[in-house]
């Protein structure tokens, strides 16, 4: 039985090096999908590059942990900037959910303004949409808009009946031990679970000054090498996977 594999590169719009890496991994590798940060410093560059790559499916990378929000978020920002203190607020059950809802709508409308179409799907920077307080908001919004959502089904959330998502999701292709064998192990693990559709998250990039400031820096370049490996596409096909995007879900 043929299974669907979505290889999604996060962080489109983060920097020019990130953008170029994603485009390279699409043109000469196995990346089929990406998600864009509409408040990223290189989002206009990402939009420009995407016009020459119509096969690349583009979703929205909802941002609540970096940069400036599009709306006033006094309950989540410090000095007007978003940050990782969102985890502390979540633990204290003090998230400003109405502000988050308004920001989600604003980022979605900004995406359409930038790219001229709806995103293929939604996910989020640092997986914040999987917070128990935030997931119902994002899942309901995705279902209402008729777009798909990255969802880790191993987390016990109720999904709206009309929400499109993959059966499996993996963030395991990440870290200091990136290799082709690791990527294929992710596929084999999904096969053993019986997943008929799978999204694998990745972050291929060329290194620039912005990426050098990231805690996750040089592995992005290693990811790019693996994802453009001449042998990987054949190994994927041998395992019964067809490369696709959330358009196919």
From Swiss-Prot:
Listed GO MF terms: chitin disaccharide deacetylase activity; deacetylase activity; diacetylchitobiose deacetylase activity; metal ion binding
Effect caused by changing residue 125 to A: Unable to induce CnbR and to grow on chitobiose
Mutant lacking the gene: phenotype: Cells lacking this gene are unable to grow on chitobiose and chitotriose.
Pathway: Glycan degradation; chitin degradation
Domain of life, source organism: Bacteria
Keywords: Carbohydrate metabolism, Chitin degradation, Cytoplasm, Hydrolase, Magnesium, Metal-binding, Polysaccharide degradation
Binding site for Mg(2+): 61, 125
Record's subcellular location: Cytoplasm
Listed GO CC annotations: cytoplasm
GO biological process: chitin catabolic process; diacetylchitobiose catabolic process; polysaccharide catabolic process
Induction data: By N,N'-diacetylchitobiose.
Cofactors that this protein relies on: Mg(2+)
Disulfide bond annotation, renumbered to this chain: none
Reactions performed catalytically: N,N'-diacetylchitobiose + H2O = N-acetyl-beta-D-glucosaminyl-(1->4)-D-glucosamine + acetate; diacetylchitobiose-6'-phosphate + H2O = N'-monoacetylchitobiose-6'-phosphate + acetate
HAMAP family with a match to the protein in the record: COD
Binding partners and assembly: Homodimer.
Name of the protein in question: Chitooligosaccharide deacetylase ChbG
UniProt lineage: Bacteria, Pseudomonadati, Pseudomonadota, Gammaproteobacteria, Enterobacterales
């Amino acid at each position: 039985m043929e299974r669907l594999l979505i290889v999604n590169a996060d962080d489109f719009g983060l920097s020019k090096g990130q953008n170029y890496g994603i485009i390279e991994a699409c043109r000469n590798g196995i990346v089929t999908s990406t998600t864009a940060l509409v408040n990223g410093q290189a989002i206009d560059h990402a939009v420009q590059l995407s016009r020459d790559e119509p096969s690349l499916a583009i979703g929205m990378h909802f941002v609540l942990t970096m940069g400036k929000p599009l709306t006033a978020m006094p309950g989540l920002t410090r000095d007007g900037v978003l940050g990782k203190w969102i985890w502390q607020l979540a633990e204290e059950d003090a998230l400003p959910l109405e502000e988050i809802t308004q920001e989600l709508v604003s980022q979605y409308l900004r995406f359409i303004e930038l790219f001229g179409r709806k995103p293929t799907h939604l996910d989020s920077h640092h997986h914040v949409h999987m917070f128990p307080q935030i997931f119902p908001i994002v899942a309901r919004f995705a279902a209402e808009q008729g777009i798909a959502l990255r969802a880790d089904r191993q987390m016990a959330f109720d999904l709206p009946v009309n929400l499109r998502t993959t059966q499996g999701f993996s963030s395991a292709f990440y870290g200091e031990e990136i290799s082709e064998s690791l990527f294929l192990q992710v596929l084999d693990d999904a096969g053993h679970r019986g997943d008929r559709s799978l999204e694998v998250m990745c972050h291929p990039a060329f290194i620039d000054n912005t990426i050098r400031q990231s805690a996750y820096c040089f592995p992005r370049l290693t990811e790019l090498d693996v994802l453009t490996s001449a042998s990987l596409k054949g190994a994927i096909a041998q395992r019964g996977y067809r490369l696709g995007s959330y358009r196919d879900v």
